């Protein structure tokens, strides 16, 4: 008996796989690719990256077979894939300006976008969210990126009766950071 509340269970009930595209094929996308062979109802239609050869290597190094990689459409420009039947775009360039331009094009084409681009989210997230509402699509942060993890911690704390006073991003750990104060923190950046 399958529990219906799990997203994976809901996904498995679909007749056709969700067609997705990645924009940027670096570390985060490679982590997804490492799990791709276990996902029956998600199909990678396209990968956009400025270095197509490296993107293909990342696919192979993440465990995709040569046969699967050959079926993926690779491009170095988002404009070349906008006419394809892609349901969800994952923007993972890490560049706030480029990421915002990509997300804007995707949203205006009436398709969903997942930002794995905290840089674009913190600089233009409100704009992109409003634009998505206007176009009746979803612009979401990716689970596993810093903003979504912070929100998860806030929700957990509130659900357990804690009053949230403050929440923020942790940074790379270094022993000297342990004794940082609001007055000394800026010296670390």
Model-derived segments and spans:
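Conserved anion/nucleotide-ligand pocket segment
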Residues: 152-189
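Rossmann-fold NAD(P)-binding glycine/threonine-rich loop
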Residues: 98-105, 117-137, 143-145, 152-156
């Amino acid at each position: 008996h399958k529990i219906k509340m799990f997203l994976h269970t809901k996904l498995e009930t679909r007749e056709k796989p969700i067609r997705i595209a990645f924009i940027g094929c670096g570390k985060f996308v490679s982590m997804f690719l490492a799990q791709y062979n276990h996902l029956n109802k998600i199909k990678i239609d396209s990968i956009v990256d400025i270095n197509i050869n490296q993107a293909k290597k990342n696919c192979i190094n993440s465990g995709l077979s040569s046969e699967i990689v050959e079926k993926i459409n690779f491009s170095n420009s988002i404009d070349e894939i906008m006419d394809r039947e892609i349901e969800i775009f994952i923007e993972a360039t890490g560049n706030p300006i480029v990421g915002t331009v990509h997300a804007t094009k995707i949203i205006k084409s009436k398709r969903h976008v997942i930002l794995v681009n905290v840089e674009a989210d913190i600089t233009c997230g409100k704009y992109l969210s409003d634009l998505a509402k206007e176009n009746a699509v979803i612009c979401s942060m990716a689970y596993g990126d810093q903003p979504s993890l912070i929100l998860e911690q806030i929700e957990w704390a509130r659900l357990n009766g804690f009053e949230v006073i403050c929440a923020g991003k942790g940074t790379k750990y270094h022993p000297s950071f342990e004794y940082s104060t609001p007055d000394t923190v800026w010296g670390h950046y």
